[in-house]
């Protein structure tokens, strides 16, 4: 089902830099979007298109490298075990394998992270030259810098949308934000699917279907590029290429609706912590990525602006409007985010340990 893009508003975020009336209009639009879908597009965001294209080009080159080369920078080689490269099948979303490969990076530089056997998180300058991925590290960090600035601006607009001081979230949570950025590659499995269907046909009684329904193969679990989930932190700002594949849960039913790429925009969504802080007034909505059978590889770049790891996310105080919108005690994943009372770092490590069980330490729920 294709979405009517009027339902996911396209907000001109540049207006937030104008007068108070324009700021209030942006805040009003964000309020409506966060209550209804938890998703919205932004345009005129100020991130140079050339930077986006440069990043997209260099990550395409990186993912085209042989697997054994990409594994030089695999996850688990630093004390931030979730940073680095992972191959198809290693990321798990709520018990189901995701059909993608990717890398996760943060704002931390190599010198800020303890490495194992002196293996750097990023390719060295010599390796960038050797594997023809020049500018890989520098382009990533320039993008992180620009997206951090943009995301802080969006968080200010979200503050105003809740009738809070513009710097409310900055003072309490994003003064030292936890930044995570993904470079995601969804290979096209179009030809593989065709081959599997042909093999199935040939294996059924010499190419003939069995007349007995009981002998037919049981239906397989539906595959996804990324399974249904909600994001964990405050805000996600996503760049997706023109292949598309993102789907968002409808506000009117249990169905999912397409959230297609729109040139010149990012798509934003709020996470569990903002849902928790607003008592369910703002929605951390389910979304997923379709299994890629398009015949073209898909690339996306999610950027996560999350609370400081040492901060303790709390319900916004003295905000009576929120109580009437409280979430149900249990969500779709049988979790109650409103009962969680630890630091964001504890919440994150618990979540990431389920997504990458092969890599993440389980040391009393603490970041190490």
From Swiss-Prot:
GO terms for molecular function: 1-aminocyclopropane-1-carboxylate oxidase activity; dioxygenase activity; metal ion binding. Residues 191-226 are annotated as: Disordered. Residues 194-203 have a biased composition (Acidic residues). It comes from the Eukaryota. It is an enzyme of class 1 (oxidoreductase). Its EC number is 1.14.17.4. One of its GO terms (biological process) is ethylene biosynthetic process. Coiled coil: none annotated. Pfam families: 2OG-FeII_Oxy, DIOX_N. Its cofactor is Fe(2+). This is 1-aminocyclopropane-1-carboxylate oxidase. It comes from Dictyostelium mucoroides.
